[in-house]
Amino acid sequence: MFLLYEYDIFWAFLVISSVIPILAFIISGVLAPLSEGPEKLSSYESGIEPIGDAWVQFRIRYYMFALVFVVFDVETVFLYPWAMSFDVLGVSVFIEALIFVLILIVGSVYAWRKGALEWS
């Protein structure tokens, strides 16, 4: 039988974790001084006066490199718990992890062939 009271701790945690940030924003909005001026509107660069335009156009190469890094980072996050409990899980989970790794290898070969890993 499905009982809703089993999830009371989850709902309490969800409400508390939602109310605390909202309260922090409300309190900071009420208590913060409202002072606007040229110093508040300028960009902050480690206490140094900004030189030139604050907007710099990045090349798309940085984004592609970061995206490939995130893919391999997520792969590590998923494979670490599997590796820690490898002896308990069995052969079926090994095959699933192998399929997961093969899909990521195909993706990395595709990124390599497309030149996403080239930094020239």
From Swiss-Prot:
Single GO BP term: photosynthesis, light reaction
Annotated membrane topology: Multi-pass membrane protein
Catalytic activity: a plastoquinone + NADH + (n+1) H(+)(in) = a plastoquinol + NAD(+) + n H(+)(out); a plastoquinone + NADPH + (n+1) H(+)(in) = a plastoquinol + NADP(+) + n H(+)(out)
GO cellular component: chloroplast thylakoid membrane; NADH dehydrogenase complex
Compartments reported by the entry: Plastid, Chloroplast thylakoid membrane
MF GO annotations: NADH dehydrogenase (ubiquinone) activity; quinone binding
UniProt KW keywords: Chloroplast, Membrane, NAD, NADP, Plastid, Plastoquinone, Quinone, Thylakoid, Translocase, Transmembrane, Transmembrane helix, Transport
Residue intervals passing through the bilayer: 9-29, 64-84, 88-108
Pfam families: Oxidored_q4 (PF00507)
EC number: 7.1.1.-
Similarity annotation: Belongs to the complex I subunit 3 family.
Quaternary structure (record): NDH is composed of at least 16 different subunits, 5 of which are encoded in the nucleus.
Role, per record: NDH shuttles electrons from NAD(P)H:plastoquinone, via FMN and iron-sulfur (Fe-S) centers, to quinones in the photosynthetic chain and possibly in a chloroplast respiratory chain. The immediate electron acceptor for the enzyme in this species is believed to be plastoquinone. Couples the redox reaction to proton translocation, and thus conserves the redox energy in a proton gradient.
Annotated protein name in UniProt: NAD(P)H-quinone oxidoreductase subunit 3, chloroplastic
The gene coding this protein: ndhC
